[in-house]
Regions:
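A short, charged helix-loop
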Residues: 148-157
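ATP-dependent adenylate-handling active sites, centered on carboxylate activation for C-N bond formation
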Residues: 1-148, 184-197
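Globin-like tetrapyrrole-binding proteins
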Residues: 177
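Structural motif
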Residues: 28, 32, 159-172
Length: 197
């Protein structure tokens, strides 16, 4: 039995304000808003729901896992070449298609020449190092360069030669799932009094 919910722009803006007011710390995942709306809708008919959030990461279903087989070849491309490609792609108007060639080239080039365990997260980031530097003030950047931030975010004990699906799965399980996906589904559902498993 399927149910359909439609939301108008006023409901979306009101929900955005509710989510913003309830968040006690930043969460950089914009999908919290549709997850909040879905949880609100589900709460009208159920008290407990099952979620598929995290399944692709757990079972290695996303593109970063498929790319693990190619990391050893991508590691041969120097970082400065990756920076040139990234800068060039940022100047070319983007296409709206999800996973378009423009999108893929721009994001993959961000990781070129960096340690393997950083590449995947650099690909996934909505911002290049240049974007990050442009957004933050010079005093902050002088103390915390984007490279230093990446080094601090990713655990130092992760082997710099990480290139296997198993290692990527460990990284996702230790960092991405608990700090993004699972936090998002937990907050969005609990804000509506819905238990999600």
């Amino acid at each position: 039995d399927n149910s359909i919910a439609e939301f108008n722009s006023n409901e979306i803006m009101k929900s955005l304000e509710i989510v913003e007011n309830k968040m006690d710390e930043p969460l950089g995942d914009p999908s919290i808003l549709p997850t909040f709306l879905l949880s609100k809708f589900a709460k009208e008919s159920v008290k407990v729901a099952l979620s598929g959030d995290g399944a692709d990461e757990l079972f290695c279903g996303y593109a970063p896992f498929k790319s693990a087989n190619y990391l050893k070849f991508l590691n041969l491309i120097p970082q400065n070449i990756g920076q040139v490609i990234t800068s060039t792609m940022e100047r070319i108007p983007s296409q709206d298609n999800y996973m378009s060639y423009h999108f893929l080239i721009k994001h993959i080039s961000r990781g070129l020449g960096w340690p393997s365990h950083q590449q995947v997260f650099r690909w996934m980031s909505p911002f290049s190092d240049n974007n990050i530097s442009a957004l933050l003030n010079k005093e902050f950047i002088s103390e915390y360069s984007p490279k230093k931030m990446w080094d601090e975010i990713l655990p130092k004990e992760i082997n710099a030669k990480t290139n296997s699906i198993d290692e990527l799965s460990k990284i996702f399980s230790r960092l991405y799932l608990p700090n993004d996906i699972l936090t998002k589904i937990d907050r969005a559902s609990m804000y509506n009094g819905l238990e999600v498993r």
